[in-house]
């Protein structure tokens, strides 16, 4: 995690100031639009999620970061998130009977694995997370 802060600080020291300006604009926007309950940050562990996470930290806004467990998550990714972002909440979706929704249960329901053209897994495993925001 420290590497990201170092990289952001190095980017802010660019002579042309373009990246510094973009970071500052992002920080100001996060502050300007901060919801009363804070932000719900969907966190995948990827570079974009890490960037948003660190921008939220820099802006000093209230936020919770959430990782949607799919049951086919790479162990290296899970270890990385737990080691570097210990405050990220791991969330799993459940059926109405309380059983966890897994990739394997979805394949059985749909009678085929997800494909490039048939993508049902995100709708069941990732998109239900979050909370409604009213403007």
Task: Set out the residue ranges of the language-model regions.
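ATP-dependent adenylation/nucleotidyltransferase module used to activate substrates
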Residues: 2-135
């Amino acid at each position: 995690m420290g590497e990201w802060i170092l990289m952001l600080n190095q980017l802010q020291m660019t002579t042309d100031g373009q990246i510094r300006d973009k970071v500052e604009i992002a920080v100001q926007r996060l502050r300007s639009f901060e919801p009363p309950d804070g932000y719900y940050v969907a966190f995948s562990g990827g570079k974009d999620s890490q960037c948003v996470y660190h921008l939220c930290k820099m802006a000093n806004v209230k936020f919770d970061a959430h990782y949607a467990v799919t049951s086919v998550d790479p162990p290296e990714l899970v270890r990385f998130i737990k080691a570097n972002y210990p405050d990220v909440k791991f969330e799993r979706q459940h059926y109405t009977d309380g059983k966890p929704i897994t990739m394997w249960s979805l394949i059985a329901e749909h009678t085929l694995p997800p494909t490039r053209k048939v993508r049902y897994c995100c709708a069941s495993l990732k998109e239900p997370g979050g909370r409604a925001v009213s403007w």
